């Protein structure tokens, strides 16, 4: 035992020092243990040869621990070597820079050879070198912070609240300005421009947006241009390619009150009607300064045009702007209609006494108010025009249509029995009473819930059929309807076969005698010829059914537990099959001994 503890001491108590782990030869110990495993023969020899699984587990765990410590030690050595090399090179470069600065030699004049630098293993450089500053060290580089492009400037919260995006539950998901496509300007070539860059999307490619500025470029550049603080967005849909009239030259700029009164630059006339519908978006001075300087010019305020000239006929086929705000239209009050009391009767109310005046039938009133039979075009009169009346109408039509179909089926059955009688559809309508005003043939409309297959079946039935044709038709109909039960029939057949197999077994088990382990133990003891004589178990249960053999086996185990019998078998794994033998030790049963048992203290003297 002491040899084993000394041998695996590093496994029981792991070595904390990384350098001492190199003294452990993991490969040699694993090889020795592998040889021991090869020599061990696992067999059924009553436990003489055993395998120590705890020792194997500790060996594997300890070997992995020692190997990981070796890897960790190598990792730390690599870090130390890299830090030493990089620190030495950094010190050499710093000293050379200071010498060049003291001598006044320009470092950029002589090309230096590019030296190999080691790749840093850390993502974050060591910040301790930037703590100590030297007095004679002056910053040689000036960090220039690049200006963020205007297209990437995040909009303000107030701008986001103007056009929010709601979900079905009413939650605010995002804003229109959160998506780049909504704020980009489409180019005539099909590209989305983050910034216009002097090109108006209303003009084709290669055309200058302001023709007048090309003539007087010198004067235009000399004059100061004002850029609007608020810029209207260009519509994303429905661009017109017709160039509008542009000013012939640069407009004279007004000052004083005109500059204070006008805070936005207007677009040319070609884009003014479409851009006027867009809400104006507020821009910061930084954003407005980044816009191109020749994009828009301030126009002179002209005389207002009359309303008749400005108003144009709207084009019904014009593409709409998905981000445009809809015009508010005045509310038009509809004309109310009262529903007759006999049309819709509420359930659950008390019965009221019928009035003396007989109200008109709803179907007749609806046809008189809704359809015009005299006119061939059947124009609608001033009648109900809302969905509730449609629902009531089609409900009434469905009821009459179902009644009509029942009468048709009854007539068809009577025609089969009495072929001499031939009635038409108009005769069946007389049985409905007031159903003469139902619908004319050209006005018949199949309701939504009607099944066209039923109507097809009624049309397919001839007026008179012979007996053979009728029988053949019924047989074909029965075969067609029984196709859907084929799968259920196969499943029921399998269930019936299973029940036929299981039911006899269940009935046989119900007929068996209830199992009593003491009763079967008494029967097994009575079969022994005498005491202390070995008798095979197969002879004791010879000629009995399988379930009786199982019960006798359980009873013999209980007898062996009570030391009434002794059980033995032949040695060997395969040779011991069906070699069970029993020997009766005593005829006295254990449960009977406990029933008649009396403690010595309770015995009478």
Swiss-Prot record:
Keywords: Chromosome, DNA condensation, Nucleus, Phosphoprotein
Chain positions with Phosphothreonine modification: 19
Pfam families attached to this UniProt entry: CNDH2_C, CNDH2_M, CNDH2_N
Regions of compositional bias (Acidic residues) in chain numbering: 256-266
Chain positions found as Phosphoserine: 95, 200, 208, 228, 232, 282, 284, 466, 492
BP term (GO), one: female meiosis chromosome separation
GO CC list: cell junction; condensed nuclear chromosome; condensin complex; intercellular bridge; membrane; nucleoplasm; nucleus
Similarity comment: Belongs to the CND2 H2 (condensin-2 subunit 2) family.
Binding partners and assembly: Component of the condensin-2 complex, which contains the SMC2 and SMC4 heterodimer, and three non SMC subunits, NCAPG2, NCAPH2 and NCAPD3 that probably regulate the complex.
Name of the featured protein: Condensin-2 complex subunit H2
Organism this protein belongs to: Homo sapiens (Human)
